[in-house]
Amino acid sequence: MTVSMVDRPADKKEASPWPADIAAEFERESKHPNPCVGTTLLSENERTRVWIIRLASGERLGFHRHVLDYFWTAISGSRGRAHVQDGTTVEYTYQPNETRHGRLGKGEFTVHDLENIGDHEMVFVIVEFKDSANKPMALPSGVAPQ
C-alpha cells in the first residue's frame, strides 16, 4: 500500500501541551537541527541516504528534521506516537509493508519524534532523495553508513 503522508488520518490527534522534557527537546532541535531521520544510516551515495529505525516497545527516536523528499516502509507492524512541529501529538497503527511518501518544497521541513507504543519491535526503512528541492543537511560527525 502506498499512501501520501497527508492522505492518511491519524488514529488519534491531540493538541494538548507536551510534557516539559519533550517541549525542551523540541526547542533544542529548533536551534540545532537534527538530520538523522533514523536510528542507523545503512547507506549513502550521491543520490540517496538509506536509514533504518529500530525501536523496542517503549523506545523513542528523538526529534529530527526532514528536509528531503523521502519514503518509508514499515517492516513490522506496530503503533507509534509522534510529537509534531505544529504542537500536536498523533498516534498511528502501522501495518507490515505499509509505505508512505513525503515531499517537501523549497524551504519546507518537517520536525517530529517517534515513540513505539506497541507491544512489538518497530522497524522502518527510510529512503531520502538528495536531489530534492532542499539541499541535504550535513550529518553529525561519527554518523556514517554501518
Where are these regions (language model features)?
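A short, N-terminal "cap"/entry segment at the start of jelly-roll beta-barrel domains
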Residues: T2-I52, A82-V84, T89-V111, E115, ...
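Short, surface-exposed binding/anchoring microloops in extracellular/periplasmic proteins
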Residues: E44-E46, I53-L68
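Glycine- and acidic-residue-biased ligand/ion/polar-headgroup-sensing regions
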Residues: H66-D86
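Active-site scaffold segments
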Residues: F71-A74, G102, F124-V125
